[in-house]
């Protein structure tokens, strides 16, 4: 069992609320002891954690730098301006808004800026790798707007001619390029051509691969996109926040949609943490990190394919993989539960043309961002792939799962996670 040691800040929490302190402590141990493969998760640095938990949470800052409704903003304005400037430098954006609370509100703000209720949007279908906010009928994006979806072909690949035909048919006001479970690189130039042909704005949701873009290992949506949204966690290794980047001509509409359209004051501690993460993303070490993320994904994919796993699209070009387990006599939920018991954490996920229900789908989704942050490389991908194969083949054998969990913890002990270096046996 691991113990954690903290300074005065955690001691104060322990004294004030030992119940919450204990749960946080247990979560720290869990994050250390487990191999975390959830594609949308990562480990942030101690510097990002420090900014996130700073006294900036005490401040209220409605408005934008130089145009606030409350006084006492001199330092907050500097912090937000630094975050904006760093985002522009990292991504080459003309305008940046760093205030959205998370990815979904960021996407909603874009719709608020350019659409009226009932207008048409065209995005990737959720069961084929899209996101709830790209027009799913259970999301506000699918309730307030006429949401049309494009799908993948039988090989699990985007068919740009089919997307073009859909766009010509429905004439969307916004064409959305982005995903939450698509392991291939998007062709932004083709999306731009389609958008221009039908007179649509091109919105790119790069929440999953923003860090890869920053690191130069994934094509950039600039200058093709009119608007780009992203979360600041996932592959970017920042806090739980979001950004909207756009061409200068859309700056006023975007800013007005975020505030006062969607939300009140920004979370200043998050803004500071975004600035810190963007500084980290501008370094050579971050470029090496993102290259390793992609290399690890490819290496793990090779091992899993060799073990007979059916990877949707036959592999990966980014950080994530989607695996169809139909040939393994196990459902996605069963696999996710068994892997978790063995110390390997990921999520069950629908696959294209899935015949099973969303809460008990045929597939699993995994990504390599978090394990790469720990220092895992090719050798560990071989070990991990073999572990996953053993779990799937013995998913009902609790003794085997417990044995693998011990192996996982031993492996994790060799690779301390960022922000959790204080954990010791």
Curated annotation (Swiss-Prot):
Pfam families the record matches: SHMT
Modified residues (N6-(pyridoxal phosphate)lysine): 234
Reactions it catalyzes: (6R)-5,10-methylene-5,6,7,8-tetrahydrofolate + glycine + H2O = (6S)-5,6,7,8-tetrahydrofolate + L-serine
Site feature location: Plays an important role in substrate specificity: 233
Signal peptide annotation: none
GO cellular component terms listed in the entry, alphabetical order: cytosol
Protein's GO biological process: glycine biosynthetic process from serine; tetrahydrofolate interconversion
Residues the entry annotates as binding (6S)-5,6,7,8-tetrahydrofolate: 126, 130-132
Record pathway: One-carbon metabolism; tetrahydrofolate interconversion; Amino-acid biosynthesis; glycine biosynthesis; glycine from L-serine: step 1/1
Sorted UniProt keywords: Amino-acid biosynthesis, Cytoplasm, One-carbon metabolism, Pyridoxal phosphate, Transferase
Disulfide pattern: none
Gene Ontology MF annotations: glycine hydroxymethyltransferase activity; pyridoxal phosphate binding
Cofactor(s) this protein requires: pyridoxal 5'-phosphate
Recorded family membership: Belongs to the SHMT family.
HAMAP family: SHMT
Subunit structure comment from the entry: Homodimer.
Function field: Catalyzes the reversible interconversion of serine and glycine with tetrahydrofolate (THF) serving as the one-carbon carrier. This reaction serves as the major source of one-carbon groups required for the biosynthesis of purines, thymidylate, methionine, and other important biomolecules. Also exhibits THF-independent aldolase activity toward beta-hydroxyamino acids, producing glycine and aldehydes, via a retro-aldol mechanism.
Protein name as it appears in the record: Serine hydroxymethyltransferase
Species per Swiss-Prot/TrEMBL record: Desulfotalea psychrophila (strain LSv54 / DSM 12343)
């Amino acid at each position: 069992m691991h113990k954690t040691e903290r300074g005065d800040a955690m001691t104060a929490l322990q004294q004030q609320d030992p119940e919450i302190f204990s749960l946080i402590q247990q979560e720290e141990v869990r994050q250390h002891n487990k191999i975390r493969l959830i594609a949308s998760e990562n480990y942030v640095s101690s510097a990002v954690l420090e900014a996130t938990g700073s006294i900036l949470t005490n401040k209220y800052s409605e408005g934008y730098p130089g145009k606030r409704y409350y006084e006492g903003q001199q330092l907050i304005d500097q912090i937000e301006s630094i975050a904006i400037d760093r985002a522009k430098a990292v991504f080459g954006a003309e305008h940046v808004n760093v205030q959205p609370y998370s990815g979904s509100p960021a996407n909603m703000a874009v719709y608020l800026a350019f659409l009226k209720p009932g207008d048409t949007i065209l995005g990737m279908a959720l069961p084929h790798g899209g996101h709830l906010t790209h027009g799913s009928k259970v999301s506000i994006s699918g309730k307030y707007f006429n949401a049309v979806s494009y799908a993948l072909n039988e090989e699990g690949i985007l068919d740009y001619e089919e997307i073009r035909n859909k766009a010509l048919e429905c004439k969307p006001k916004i064409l959305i390029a982005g995903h939450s479970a698509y392991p291939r690189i998007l062709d932004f130039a083709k999306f731009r051509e389609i958008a221009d042909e039908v007179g649509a704005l091109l919105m790119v949701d790069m929440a999953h691969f923003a860090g890869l873009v920053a690191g130069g290992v994934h094509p950039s949506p600039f200058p093709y996109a009119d608007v780009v949204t992203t979360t600041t966690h996932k592959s970017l290794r920042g806090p739980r926040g979001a950004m909207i980047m756009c061409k200068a001509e859309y700056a006023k509409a975007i800013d007005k949609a975020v505030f006062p359209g969607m939300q009140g004051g920004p979370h200043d501690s998050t803004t500071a943490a975004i600035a810190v993460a963007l500084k980290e993303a501008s370094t050579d070490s971050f470029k090496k990190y993102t290259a390793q993320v992609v290399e690890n994904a490819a290496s793990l994919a090779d091992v899993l394919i060799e073990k007979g796993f059916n990877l949707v699209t036959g592999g990966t070009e980014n950080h994530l993989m989607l695996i169809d387990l139909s040939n393994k006599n196990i459902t996605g939920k069963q696999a996710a539960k068994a892997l978790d018991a063995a110390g390997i954490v990921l999520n069950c996920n629908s696959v294209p043309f899935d015949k099973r229900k969303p809460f008990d789908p045929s597939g699993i989704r995994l990504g390599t961002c978090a394990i790469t942050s720990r220092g895992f490389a090719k050798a560990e991908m071989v070990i991990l792939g073999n572990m996953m194969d053993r779990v799937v083949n013995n998913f009902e054998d609790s003794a085997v799962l417990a044995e693998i969990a011990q192996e996982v913890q031993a492996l994790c002990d060799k690779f301390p996670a960022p922000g959790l270096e204080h954990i010791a046996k």
